Amino acid sequence: MRRSVHSLAAVAAVAALGLAACSGGTSSSSSADAEQTYGPGALPTVTEGKLTVATSDPAYSPWILNNDPASGEGYESAVIYALAEELGYSADNVQWVRATFESSITPGAKDWDLNIQQFSITDERRNAVNFTSPYYTTSEAIIAKAGTPAADAKSIADLKDVLIGVQAGTTSQQFASDTLEPGLSQKLQMFNSSDDTVLALQTGRVDAIVVDLPTAFNMIATQVDNGVIVGQFADAQDGENYGIVLPKGSKLTPTVSAAVDRLAESGKLDELHEKWLNEAQNVPILK
């Protein structure tokens, strides 16, 4: 479930305090942003006059529809085009590239300005890359096949004997390792990709899988036969924040983060959420 735009804006205000250090600047991000000239050629992008944005390959709904980020369809694609407009770039001046999840949060030179693919903001990742203010807040969820013992769980304790799978290297894996595994009778099963994780559930190699809530809704609609969302593990105030990634030390960080803040404050992020991520049912919280 997502945090309200007002709460996101409050988080953004706190996050902004650290942006100057992240970007190498010494003045406040708000004053720097106020003096910034926007538009093609005005910002220090990797390709002059263009805003280059990376995402995963493939990219999944509801974040990007039909693996086509340039369509503007799906929450993250729509956020990028709203952000580009805020920065003075037309849709024609946005160009997309692909990057793996792990390479995107590894130190080193990048061929993109921004990267969006459900990156949770963590202190560890801040050592390697910069983040904008949050554009979305979610929680982890657990999926199982309907009619199985795993699907009947009403609490975390009920998951004790459930064999759980998760994609390695994700915050879902970190959450499951830290919060769930100590109380499980069996070790977590790790998989290299989202598709491998789903396949493990489909074929019975695991009883349930842990993913973020919007992905869970998409999986039970399009990938997992007879799948159900058993529950989520946090409410709207305790979920994890997603931020757009920039290369470490990027001079764009304060400007882009301030633009994300404006989208939150104006209600645009709420509007896009209602269009692309409006969950159709209430999901119980497992405690």
Residue ranges, per PLM feature:
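Periplasmic-binding protein-like
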Residues: 57, 137-144, 214, 221-261, ...
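Extracytoplasmic small-molecule ligand-binding "clamshell" domains
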Residues: 32-115
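Ligand-binding clefts/hinges and TM-proximal coupling segments of bilobed small-molecule sensing domains
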Residues: 24, 28-34, 171-188, 228-229, ...
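Acidic, polar ligand-binding/catalytic clefts
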Residues: 93-156
